[in-house]
């Protein structure tokens, strides 16, 4: 399954130890999505559409109310790059 360049970039950051945190409103709808790199920087290239695509492809998952992390399926989808850890 091919993934877009934006999805590839996000999965690459998550594979290096990043996380996606959500802020929800009172009706449990997503209000804000923030992608943090492993160094604590905020990556601004994640939007709701890309988040939903990655979730639909089961490349990211959250358990127990924790931030979203990359799954083993996501690791299979991400193409290897030299600076992956």
Swiss-Prot record:
A Pfam family hit: YjhX_toxin
Top-level taxon in the UniProt lineage: Bacteria
Segments crossing the lipid bilayer: none
Family the UniProt entry places it in: Belongs to the UPF0386 family.
The protein's name: UPF0386 protein Atu1321
